[in-house]
Amino acid sequence: AANDGKKKYGYYESEEKIIENMYNATGLERGIRHPAVYLMEAADDITYIGDDIEDGVKKGYIDIDTEYERLKKRYKSQQKNFFISCDNYFEQINEKMSKSDQLNAKARYFRNTIQGYLINKAKEEFLNNYECIMSGDYGNVALLERDSNMKSFIGELKGITGRNCFGCREVLALELVGHKVITGLLDILVPAVLRKDCNYEDTKQYEGKIANIISSNYIYIAKQDYNYESKDDPMDEKTRKLEELSDYEKIHLVVDFVSGMTDSYAMNLYQELMGIKLPYQ
């Protein structure tokens, strides 16, 4: 589906009817965000901001002392309570711990403190604008980005990871491997499910072998005809054969299957299908 210039895409065209039912059930109008979206969006940012910085320190990519001082120099007057808390704790561990232990302790405390601080800020913003949010008038801005100072602070926190981690060899190598695995799986699965005049239940055929690799849960969902409405029983479902799906639906099935894989499962399946390793190894 088109994203209308937004940062994230919405939903598949095939899910239009499901989304329409959701709008009707919740009473939302198109373009109006559900109140829970603001909280989920804030929770996602808060979690990853703190965790990514801590991981970067542990792997040796981020110098917590340098980045903290840079952050404090720019934002101390705006986020005073946060920096007072960190300063007091950092001073204590500088006196009690070795240099190597200090880094992990500071990173852990920084993560916990910044997450707690941002949770309170998001909660405060939500409660202060509760009526506006519930009426759908708050707009598409994130809870932690409505205030320009807080938006700048959030951007700088994300920038710590961006400057120090995203360009390092380990991250780039993982991205390249991920690209190879995902495109490799799609190159194998998509042509097989698009093959015409084949029996997907016949595992003697190549296409049948591929179809049986795809999780039965995804196949079950793909085979449901959500446009079918029974006159006798609204809960009645119409199940189709895999061969009866359109090309769009078949590709949709493969994309759902691949996107639902864990990293390790995707890697193992790719290696098995490419003949790099045997399934029972």
Language model regions located:
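Intrinsically disordered or highly flexible coil/loop and linker segments, enriched in small
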Residues: L28-H34, D45-K59, E124-G136, R163-L174, ...
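Sequence-structural signature of the catalytic-core scaffold of metal-dependent phosphohydrolases
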Residues: A1-R108, I119
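Secondary-structure capping and boundary motifs in well-ordered enzyme cores
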Residues: G31-L39, A107-R111, Q115, R146-F153, ...
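Substrate-recognition/cap regions that form aromatic- and gly/pro-loop-enriched pockets
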Residues: L127-K231
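Divalent metal-coordination and catalytic microenvironments
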Residues: D44, I182, V258
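Polyanionic (Asp/Glu-rich) segments that form extended negatively charged tracts
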Residues: Q78-N140, D197-D202, K209, Y218, ...
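C-terminal amphipathic alpha-helical interaction region
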Residues: T203-E272, I276
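Glycine- and acidic
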Residues: N24-P35, K99-A105, T161-V171, D247-V255
